[in-house]
Amino acid sequence: MTQRKYFGTDGVRGEVGGEVINAAFALRLGYAAGRVLARQHGGRGGSRPQVVIGKDTRISGYMLESALEAGLSAAGIDVLLAGPVPTPAVAYLTRALRLVAGIVISASHNPYQDNGIKFFSAQGMKLPDEVEAEIEAALHEPLGCVGSEALGRARRMQDSQGRYIEFCKSTFPNDLDLNGVKIVVDAAHGAAYNVAPHVFRELGADVHAIGVSPDGFNINEGVGALHPESLARAVRERGAHLGIALDGDADRLQMVDGDGRIYNGDELLYAIVRERMSRGTVAGVVGTLMTNYGFELEMQRLGVGFERAKVGDRYVMEQMQARGWLYGGESSGHLICLDCHTTGDGIIAALQVLTALRRGNVPLADWLGDLRMYPQKMINVPLAPGTDWKSHAGLAAATRAVEAELAGRGRVLIRASGTEPKLRLMVEAEEPALAASCAEKLAASLA
């Protein structure tokens, strides 16, 4: 397989105007992807293959959308332009409209200066590695154009948001509603700025929306799932029962209760799993290396299988598919319920939590019941480039000693940062003081 140069774990991403996130590269990428899709799907039923393009609210989305559209059309692919919609909406539209692929223009939780391009398969799932490799290889081919009679056409969808709103609502039980529930919805000035408030209002909730005034530059700025403290303030000020925070492309969720307490992805995943267990058996759940130790212990107590994947929703999904499990997620709020959707979806995940609370008729804190999140201590230690920390004898000895000290009362995670020259030393333990002292022992071994 060709080594991937441009595609990371979540498509192509970078700073606007940089090596890959620019108009010229987007044109080439659209043409390369179109060539691959035409080879795979061309000639079926005598019609041209179709793809859908959705985007978030960054100012650069217009430029990248136009360039991708031109490249795809030059390769003989018809293009549906969905406009600003959440990433999971593109996955849904791709599958529902029987398209050959979906394309998302978004850098998720990053600031507006960044953007990205990622693909969904015809099944509404992340594009397989081998197809991404084919597209990478096609990027090295000369930019061309099919004959005029075979050129693709583009048109704007008029009902993309409405279709997705109805799909989200369909994942909430028909015998329940949100009448009488006061909810603050924070859409991070991102892709869900219009659809998210509509979903919860149409189910009966009294909704106050914040983060719904995108200007091309304010996406994720002090609002959304990365800044749930803004939501917590709004919930307390409004006297709301709950708050729902999404990130820029609405595939990430954090929630807040009426007291302003913030709940992360581990706690929300537990809420969903517990509700599903009230209706039947849950075979297993996939978390990540960062999933709290308390979540793992609670899964063990409930007799539910638990596996840790590498950090990244792509890896969570791979583990879920390998084991045939339906539920998985990350502490950051990427939550996947394969009995509802083919990808992580912040709005749908929130609806599953609300299902649990309406069925149980209890506040979120009470629904979490016996779940005890373990205190965490993280220390970042500078790491010189090229350092082989895995072979460091002092760190290895300290790790063994700390793990013996914890002995079922916590865990140790040591990993190099993917973005900075640092080694991250993380300890979770029953008590904050124990977590701190163990982390400091690990750090001291590297001094």
Swiss-Prot record:
Residues annotated to bind Mg(2+): S108, D247, D249, D251
Cofactor dependence: Mg(2+)
Protein name (record): Phosphoglucosamine mutase
UniProt GO MF annotations: magnesium ion binding; phosphoglucosamine mutase activity; phosphomannomutase activity
Its biological purpose: Catalyzes the conversion of glucosamine-6-phosphate to glucosamine-1-phosphate.
Gene Ontology cellular component list: cytosol
PROSITE patterns, per database record: PGM_PMM
Catalytic residue list: S108
One Gene Ontology term from the biological process aspect of the record: carbohydrate metabolic process
Residue positions where Phosphoserine is found in the record: S108
Post-translational changes noted in the entry: Activated by phosphorylation.
KW Isomerase (keyword) present: yes
